[in-house]
Amino acid sequence: SDFRNAAVHERQKELVVTATTTCCGYNPMTSCPRCMCDSSCNKKKKPGRRND
């Protein structure tokens, strides 16, 4: 069952990536930070935590 859970999580990740990629070239009419394409925004910005 662990493998199935992992597969589900992978699918969810892909869905998020696909939704994010819509504004990174596939849909020029949607503007968004370029770092959203490779998820570099999320790595720098940790919601709920302010330790800089």
From Swiss-Prot:
The modification Proline amide is found at P47. Contains 3 disulfide bonds. Transmembrane segments: none annotated. The modification Pyrrolidone carboxylic acid is found at Q12. Pfam families: Toxin_8. Keywords: Amidation, Disulfide bond, Gamma-carboxyglutamic acid, Glycoprotein, Hydroxylation, Ion channel impairing toxin, Neurotoxin, Pyrrolidone carboxylic acid, Secreted, Toxin. The modification 4-carboxyglutamate is found at E14. It comes from Conus achatinus. Residues 1-11, 48-52 form a propeptide. The keyword Secreted applies. It is found in: Secreted. The modification 4-hydroxyproline is found at P28, P33, P47. This is Conotoxin Ac4.3a. GO terms for molecular function: acetylcholine receptor inhibitor activity; ion channel regulator activity; toxin activity. Glycans are attached at T18, T20. Belongs to the conotoxin A superfamily. It comes from the Eukaryota. Expressed by the venom duct. One of its GO terms (cellular component) is extracellular region. The cysteine framework is IV (CC-C-C-C-C). Its main location: secreted. Probable neurotoxin with ion channel inhibitor activity.
